[in-house]
Amino acid sequence: ARYSVVRWLPSETENAVGPHVHDPRSGEILDSDIQMYHNVMRLASAWYFIQSGPLNPRAAKLPLPDDILGKIVQFVVAHEVGHTLGFPHNMKASSMYETAKVRDKAWVKKMGHTPSIMDYSRFNYVAQPEDGIDPADLVPRVGPYDIWATAWGYKPIPGATTPAEERPVLDEWARQQEQTPWFRFMTSNARGADPGEITEAVGDADPVQATGLGVKNLARVMKMLLPATEKKGEDWENLEDMYGRVLGQWTREMLHVAGVVGGVDSHQKNGGQAGLLFTTIPAARQRKAVEFLSAQAFATPAYLVDPAILRRIEPDGVLARLRNAQSSVLESLLTPTRVQRMTEQEVLDGDKAYKPLDLLADLRRGIFTELAAPAPKIDAFRRNLQQTYLEAMHNRVNGGAAPPTHRWLYRGELKSLSGEIARALPRTSDRPTRLFLEDAKEQIARILDPKFAPPASPSLSLPLRRALEANGAESCWQELTITRDGIKLQ
């Protein structure tokens, strides 16, 4: 094309892309056209409200004011301009700032809350209202990594006339990453194992701390949701949509914590540089992540269950919504790749490792906490979660959700759980709890007996995991919404 332009497309698609055409011989960029699909504004506005609404009083009502929307458009276009210049995503960037720094208003004013606009780090959901962050600094901007990477890619090198002559200088510049961590890029071949390279994260140097702060803001957003979306004479469709997006944000943040389990810290190094590319995350950090999920994800998040909202959008459905959200977290913890990494960590790190058996025992204690009570009583939300757990185990023992080499783990865990249920049954006087536990014990017996085990059911979270791991330019702006019918990606 003769001109490189920003195109605004009349489309309901919630996305934007920045493709370019380049000469494969030289790398010269010949043409680029940023494509802004109209409904990317709906997506980005919803993210701003859900992630940073409690930090900006002017964002308490939807739609957002024009000047805030203008800042959001600037952010989206700048990210896509990066692609047109040849920059790939850098999911490592946001984890290079300590979590406390993204709450420091002086730091954020100077450095932003992420070093790179090419990260999938959206609006600052970690900062708290009392931190006093300037609302103008809640939106990502071109950061120190972007400036440094632009110089590395485009700054002339006097005297160099060939790529080979440029190489020593470029390598010297690249080594600045060793002293300045926010110049670092994603590690090659990390394969999703580094929680510092997760998407849609802020302050993910410590995902547990960041998510703990994030859910405080989500509780505030839930109180804002009804007045923000209510319009005289209109239905509650927008309220239902935003509530599903809030649950999606909650799910993403919990998945950030799940990424710590079986994870590694990675740092790109080449020949001649000391140190390892991959270092196992210490067992104490992994165990802390599971404890957090037991307390925050598997214990019912009461702030997400607001009758004033729920009775305006549907006659029933909250049990299914929360089950879908919690199921995605549980399934993420039990993926074959994660369990395999933990198995290899046990082999390589020995007693220092957080082992697969440790994970399963901690999950059992967190999901079936009531079994240890003097008089067990399990409510409907927790029965839903525990049934989800049994189905996940069934899919691993009798289905294709785990390789045969892992099956013994899940069979042993079900036997332990069956014993705990048997010991708890005489102590409960609550009829629903008794009936549920009796049924759960029978389910376990059928799962473990190949003569009676029914076919395993497909996991809703398998396609979710694949979609969330996609980080190509075509998926820069991907929303996760939790509905009563399942998980929607758009």
Residue ranges of model-derived segments:
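Alpha-helix termini
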Residues: 40, 44, 92-95, 99
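Short linear motifs at secondary-structure transitions and domain/linker junctions
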Residues: 5-12, 91-96, 279
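Structured DNA-binding interfaces in DNA transaction proteins
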Residues: 1, 90, 119
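Conserved catalytic/binding loops enriched for acidic/polar residues
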Residues: 94-490
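Metzincin-family zinc-dependent endopeptidase catalytic domain
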Residues: 1-84, 109-113, 123-126, 284, ...
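Catalytic Zn2+-binding segment of zinc metalloproteases
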Residues: 81-97
